[in-house]
């Protein structure tokens, strides 16, 4: 039986179970492979045969929520015309190794959650990394999403992604890279602020340079225990507990030359080498004395150094 016939038959079975009378045609099934509500509590179940191992359909434009949910035998999917992928669409597909969704612009929350065999995911048209997108994808080492401009919480938590390039990411939500414990380096040149909890507990992150970040919000880098070097060229403010528990942080560079960066609370550096007198904050020489006496910064007066005096560290 062809896959479309199977889908149609399953649609008929679900319709019989729910008491609905509207006919689901093959064309409709091909257009929207989606989750069907089976009871009043909003739970949905996959409508795809549990024995399927490969799926390819160039006609599909929408992959609905839960469409392939928990398909343990599914190894490859190709839906080259799909522009939208619903929540949990491939969640739990533990054998999935190949995904082809070149036109998808929207991929909803948890779409690839717990796809534990997936090593690479290409989302060339997606603009938002939605919540828990690849949560628990314990083999995933590469994510290609060059058009992403925003994100939501825990998008890559539980993956093995070490290097992440998001050249257009500008305004992420809070906690987007929280618990991304394998992440070592990031390239995000357009990022304009560090939202609350943005890199919270990204324990492998080593160095960061954010040329366009103007503010570092509450606990945005907290618990980044491998983080040793932070360069914030135009940053204007550092909120509470931003670097709390960054136990390797020995270099912070604040290059903004027209005014000092405000510090909301001294706890921004609690449990760091800077707080322990072993790390340093590099600022423009013209602002050095102002930083030493500024509110909250005065606590770390002995840790300030002039950028110009340490070109080997700061690049001058």
What is each of the regions a protein language model found here?
Residues 309-315:
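Short, low-complexity, Pro/Ser/Thr/Gly-rich segments in the mature regions of secreted, periplasmic
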Residues 1, 315-316:
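Short acidic DE-rich linear segments
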Residues 265-271, 289-302:
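Short, aromatic/basic amphipathic alpha-helical patches
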Residues 64-67, 86-91, 108-113, 130-135, ...:
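Consensus positions within tandem repeat domains that build extended binding/scaffold surfaces
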Residues 47-62, 71-84, 94-106, 116-128, ...:
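Structural signature of tandem-repeat unit edges
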Residues 20-28, 297-306:
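Short, surface-exposed acidic
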Residues 1-62, 277:
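Surface-exposed receptor/substrate recognition regions of extracellular proteins
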